[in-house]
Amino acid sequence: TLPPPSEWAFHLDLWQNPYAVSRYYNVEPFSKEHFDLMRPLMKLYADAGGKVITASIMHKPWNGQTYDAFESMVTWLKKADGTWYFDYTVFDKWVEFMIDLGVKKQISCYSMVPWRLSFQYFDQASNSFKFLEAKPGEAAYEEFWINMLQDFAKHLKAKGWFDITHIAMD
């Protein structure tokens, strides 16, 4: 007799794309209806021994590689005064949902180095979405990510998820 999947040593990491489910069923992403539709699908992953939660912390980390784009589960907002604000509401809902299903060994957050090196944020001063084009090593890239990572680390520690969270790349 096999032990429950939560006790399996095998590290199963299959990417999940909740945005594909919302598009397929034409429901609002991360609404109650969306979670109800995802529950049996993600339960299959958990029951197969899935250990890793796939989270996208930026807009389209893989450009257009997948039919359904991975949107950001974190809202990046540059305030009118130039400071940054990050809203983790969607990220938290998604992670809590997956943990409740039993997927709780690791959270893989994609990605600091996306294919296009283009980073979307909402600019409060212009009331519009903007894109920062920057490469690792450039001052703009470092400023952009340092603000987010410091805030993200604080948030993850408050939620008790810091030790299981990884910044992932593809």
Regions of interest found by a model, annotated:
Residues 1-170:
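Aromatic-lined carbohydrate-binding surfaces of glycoside hydrolases
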